[in-house]
Curated annotation (Swiss-Prot):
UniProt-listed NCBIfam families: PRK02492.1
Stated family: Belongs to the deoxyhypusine synthase family.
Broadest EC class assigned to this enzyme: transferase
Name this protein carries in UniProt: Deoxyhypusine synthase-like protein
Pfam families, per the entry: DS
InterPro entries: Deoxyhypusine_synthase (IPR002773), Deoxyhypusine_synthase-like (IPR023496), Deoxyhypusine_synthase_sf (IPR036982), DHS-like_NAD/FAD-binding_dom (IPR029035)
EC number: 2.5.-.-
Entry superkingdom: Bacteria
HAMAP family xref list: DHS_like
The species this protein was found in: Chlorobaculum parvum (strain DSM 263 / NCIMB 8327)
Disulfide bond residue pairs: none
Gene Ontology terms: cellular component: cytoplasm
Alphabetic keyword roster: Transferase
Length: 350
């Protein structure tokens, strides 16, 4: 066992560090990229649109997250955006929020690795690999168990993923864990986080353990409630902008709230006014992740005046786009919407 621990420690030596957006003013460089070609020009236009979302004080900004972003070093970018009131709601894969951000709040790290590693050796040492990044599987199991502990502490019933993630924020606070966390910062700021496929991560392992041991009286996640709550945000704040990192469920879920509002009788609801997506997916296979925002306009989801696709890898493009919008400082004076408070408010009986 001691030899195994030493072998494992040999792989887990250099932690991934998170880049922020407040130190380096990238505005001059991004503005010069506007006179280049290809994805440089697309990125510059995307940055200007994300800045417009900040400048337009009526616009609620929804950030969507797909792909392995937090493990790759983008956590601080998102925390900086939350801290400076640049984001009003987040829709994410469960892995980014639970397996990666909350995992780090528990005190664990992601580690620099190699895409050329011997995966059979990693498996023997309980090291999980995400391309060139390592995660300690034994520590991930602690994260799984913590999700079960949180579920066990809650009143049985059906919750939206947002409501469960609020409890995760409370847990960080109560246990004195690392507050430099997306989950905690969103909890502190009243910014809702939705994970429509919440069971597809450590939350799923924790919840299945919780339900297995409490078969008749347990916590469950209601994904339709997620959809209803996010749609309510659109109904209450008609003008919206979406900044999409990757595609997948978070992208489609967020685009669909326009149609959902129409289904609920709000036929004059606006399409998303602003839309930017960073992706490496290809539109030609018909899959959602690479489908263009112009295509989304045919479904009545996204307006085409202020939309931009950037075909680039997120760890390169997101800090530049978010950093540009931060240093333009048009987020100053944006109202704090605190959608969590709005969604938690009990209806007044007539």
């Amino acid at each position: 066992m001691e030899e195994r621990s030493m072998q494992k420690a040999g792989f887990l030596k250099e932690p991934i560090k998170h880049i922020g957006i407040t130190k380096h003013n990238v505005v001059p460089m991004v503005e010069e990229m506007a006179d280049m070609a290809f994805q440089a020009r697309n990125l510059a236009r995307a940055a200007s649109i994300v800045d417009l979302m900040q400048k337009d004080k009526e616009c609620a900004v929804i950030l969507t997250l797909a792909g392995s972003l937090i493990s790759a070093g983008l956590k601080q970018v998102i925390i900086d955006m939350l801290e400076h009131n640049m984001v009003d709601a987040i829709v994410s894969t469960g892995a980014n929020i639970v397996d990666q951000d909350f995992f780090e709040a528990l005190g664990f790290k992601h580690w620099k690795g190699s895409q050329f590693a011997d995966d059979s050796e990693l498996r023997e040492l309980a090291i999980d690999r995400i391309y060139d990044t390592y995660i300690d599987e034994d520590e991930l199991r602690v994260c799984d168990d913590t999700m079960a502990i949180i579920a066990n502490s809650m009143q049985p019933g059906a919750y939206s993923s947002r409501e469960f993630i609020v409890e995760m924020g409370k847990y960080i606070e109560e246990k004195g864990l690392d507050k430099n966390s997306i989950v905690y910062k969103a909890y502190e700021k009243g910014v809702p986080i939705f994970c429509p496929a919440f069971s597809d991560c450590s939350a799923g392992f924790g919840l299945v353990h919780h339900q297995w041991n409490n078969p008749d009286n347990h916590v469950s996640i209601d994904s339709v409630k997620d959809f209803r709550e996010l749609t309510k945000i659109k109904i209450e704040n008609d003008k919206t902008g979406i900044f999409m990192i990757g595609g997948g469920v978070p992208k489609n879920f967020t685009q669909d709230i326009v149609v959902a509002a129409e289904v609920l009788g709000y036929e004059d609801v606006s399409m998303h006014t602003y839309a930017v997506q960073i992706t490496v997916a290809d539109e030609r296979d018909g899959a959602l992740s690479g489908s263009t925002l112009k295509e989304a306009s045919s479904w009545g989801k996204v307006d085409t005046v202020y939309e931009q696709m950037v075909f680039a890898e997120a760890t390169v493009a997101m800090p530049l786009i978010a950093g540009y919008a931060y240093h333009k400082r048009n987020w100053e004076g944006r109202p704090e919407r605190n959608f969590n408070a709005m969604l938690d408010a009990k209806p007044v009986n007539a």
